């Protein structure tokens, strides 16, 4: 019986077996224990508005600042639905209004780094705190063409990691169809072991995704592979932020 072990089981906190000798021994009055249900009061839950505000305060002011590197595939194979999905992913995470609705909006001290790539990695662009509009514009206007070299782009991401890593929670988000045309995985593994500092790589698949290469990256970095084609991008980024 739970009550013999000191656990109340009755409705409202009352004792169901108050007359049991061993139950009485666990709930002794001389210890100051009141076995009446009247001493146990319910707690009024806060309103939804209060909960929303508390979540916003945590996301934008209390949690450790994040340093996110967005490595986004703009190769020819991403043309059409692939690019459209990747842009929607960026909007879900970096558009202030969309991100706020999912409680993943950037905070005052967050850093976001945008690295577009195809066969070559482009110049990294950085946004401080909530000023992400320029990154979104760059992401929307980037054409999808050329070949694909995921590993070169990730090498650029490693070179853009913060020197003061302890001040941030750092992660790399790779948005791609997973069809890298180069066999540089072994070289990248060596660089990651040297420079990666345990930063997780979260791959989000779009277009005609091939998860095989992405699973290798997840295993290497203790990251994870997500399918961004199911339309529920907010849930994906909430989980990424949960790791973050």
How should these model regions be labeled?
Residues 61-175, 179, 202-213, 232-236:
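Von Willebrand factor
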Residues 69, 76, 84, 88-95, ...:
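Solvent-exposed, polar/charged alpha-helical surfaces in well-ordered, non-transmembrane soluble domains
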Residues 82-85, 141-144, 178-231, 237-240:
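VWA/integrin I-like adhesion module and closely mimicked acidic/polar interface patches used
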